[in-house]
């Protein structure tokens, strides 16, 4: 009976996380404790998103047209995630690119309007994703397209574990609360196992360096500004995804 209750709770946490991070499950109301518990499932949500977005091309859709496949993959990821993480990426590029600090940094970060640095970040980020995906497909290692969202979401959990949430963001607080040592170890294990299976051990090792650099940079920036919010987490997911694709090419 206890096992059944545990499995039911974990299933609910997975569904809640899927609905929060993607449109692949219905969005549902959740308590703070449920949101925190769902953090452990972020890499699994990434795996589901990767399968949905890369699966058609792995099965041969648009075979022989790697540029179109790469663009389709990026477009499907945008659709599946509602552009949620790219929004955080753009906001962070605006705030960081302005060289602002303190309250001014947070004012820019939370401004719903996009600035020049945000536009540049989106253009070069999406362009980079398409180019890297094209190279991965051309190398015949398209399994890495499935793995990239896994690494991105695991990186987000590591970032949340490294930075005190501060008082500026409910999402930052809840994610940090869920990013316990055991959760980080579980996410790392899931990410390593899926990476070895889908991209190969050399790609996992090669992706670790740029991903670690991204987490270290975001950690330093968040600590300087007194905490993190959802924009930091979204930007970390994007950087983790790009790191997975880059690592696969370099391996």
Swiss-Prot record:
The chain crosses the membrane at residues 44-64, 114-134, 143-163, 177-197, 198-218. One of its GO terms (molecular function) is adenosylcobinamide-GDP ribazoletransferase activity. It catalyses: alpha-ribazole + adenosylcob(III)inamide-GDP = adenosylcob(III)alamin + GMP + H(+); alpha-ribazole 5'-phosphate + adenosylcob(III)inamide-GDP = adenosylcob(III)alamin 5'-phosphate + GMP + H(+). Pfam families: CobS. Coiled coil: none annotated. One of its GO terms (cellular component) is plasma membrane. It is found in: Cell inner membrane. It is a multi-pass membrane protein. One of its GO terms (biological process) is cobalamin biosynthetic process. Its EC number is 2.7.8.26. InterPro entries: CobS (IPR003805). Its cofactor is Mg(2+). Pathway: Cofactor biosynthesis; adenosylcobalamin biosynthesis; adenosylcobalamin from cob(II)yrinate a,c-diamide: step 7/7. Keywords: Cell inner membrane, Cell membrane, Cobalamin biosynthesis, Magnesium, Membrane, Transferase, Transmembrane, Transmembrane helix. Belongs to the CobS family. PANTHER family: ADENOSYLCOBINAMIDE-GDP RIBAZOLETRANSFERASE (PTHR34148:SF1). Joins adenosylcobinamide-GDP and alpha-ribazole to generate adenosylcobalamin (Ado-cobalamin). Also synthesizes adenosylcobalamin 5'-phosphate from adenosylcobinamide-GDP and alpha-ribazole 5'-phosphate. This is Adenosylcobinamide-GDP ribazoletransferase. It comes from Nitratidesulfovibrio vulgaris (strain DSM 19637 / Miyazaki F).
